[in-house]
Design a protein with these regions (language model features):
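Short helices/loops that flank or line small-molecule/ion binding pockets
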Residues: 77-91, 104-105, 134, 175-190, ...
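Short loop->beta-strand "edge-of-pocket" segments that line small-molecule binding or catalytic clefts
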Residues: 34-43, 49, 134-151
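Glycine/small-residue-rich loop that forms an oxyanion/phosphate-binding "nest" at active or ligand-binding sites
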Residues: 100-124
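Bacterial N-terminal signal peptides
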Residues: 9-20
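Periplasmic-binding protein-like
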Residues: 33-43, 115-124, 202-243, 253-275
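Extracytoplasmic small-molecule ligand-binding "clamshell" domains
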Residues: 26-95
Length: 286
């Protein structure tokens, strides 16, 4: 009963956070005459994204003299439609989304984590007898979305390279992937290193990593070409300044951006073009 009460309280608190964030005029400097849209790829639930990003954007916005409207699409495909139409002004997106956004709308990456590189993983239940990727042939594999970079595109490309046919089942979020494997709805699932690390111990303990991909520069914050260089620079400086105090470091840890660094498309994301992942893309609504 106590556990149920705690769960209900947590859900209620998250709902309040979502509602308050959604109803706020903007996050950051309230006197700013310009409100920038800030979209976050929905790898997690909207409640979790609002809980972690809202306080960070509030502080960064105040420091930088900027104000943001935090937006979270219901699904990754919906997020992609908005991105490839050029709607978000600031956006936190996966590395291959950064490639597409640069090619389609000239978005420029601004900063990303410098230490925790991104890897795609395939997980199975901890008690699964499966030892090799070959054993997944013809099986249902949970993936968050068709165009999730490390959790889907890299996994499907790796399986295709090995000539292992799988049945991908798209379940919207990384959290859903891990739980579908635990619940035996799929024999394996695709995720990324840090979303598994962020799961509660009860989930992590029931899973085993079967495969891990090469490491890549992780998700960046990128900006639409309409965002002035001065606004980009103020945002970057404010984000880097968060590393200087404990509260700021906790905010960065919450979004898996503990050691932010300035990044460029040419150096950090253009090399992904050579992976030729476009053959695995599924784009809708364009």
């Amino acid at each position: 009963m106590h556990a149920l009460k705690r769960t209900l309280f947590g859900l209620f608190s998250s709902a309040l956070l979502v509602a308050s964030a959604a109803n706020a005029a903007c996050l950051g400097e309230q006197s700013s005459t310009k409100v920038y849209t800030f979209d976050v790829v929905p790898q997690h639930t909207a409640a979790k994204i609002y809980t972690t990003w809202s306080p960070l954007l509030q502080r960064v916005g105040q420091e930088a003299g900027l104000c943001f409207e935090l937006r979270v699409a219901a699904t990754i495909p919906e997020f992609e439609q908005k991105l490839l139409k050029g709607e978000p002004e600031f956006v936190f997106l996966n590395p291959y989304h950064a490639v597409l956004a640069n090619q389609k709308k000239k978005y420029q990456p601004l900063l990303a984590d410098s230490e925790d590189l991104l890897t795609g993983i395939l997980v199975v239940r901890a008690d699964s007898p499966i030892k090799s990727l070959d054993e997944l042939k013809g099986k249902n594999i949970s993936l968050p979305a068709p165009n999730a970079f490390a959790a889907s595109l890299l996994i499907r490309a790796e399986m295709a390279k090995r000539k292992i046919d799988i049945n991908p089942v798209f379940v919207k979020t990384h959290s859903n992937v891990y739980r579908s494997v635990i619940g035996k709805d799929a024999i394996a699932g695709g995720g990324v290193n840090y979303t598994l690390d962020n799961e509660v111990p009860e989930v992590r303990q029931q899973l085993r990593v079967l495969f891990e991909s090469q490491a890549y520069t992780p998700h960046p914050v990128a900006t639409h070409p309409s965002v002035p260089a001065a606004a980009r620079e103020r945002f970057l400086k404010a984000m880097l300044k968060l590393t200087q105090d404990e509260e700021g470091r906790k905010l960065l840890d919450g979004i898996n951006l503990s050691k932010p660094q300035a990044v460029t498309y040419a150096k950090h994301y253009k090399p992904l073009e050579s992976l030729h992942l476009e053959k695995f893309l599924v784009l809708t609504g364009q």
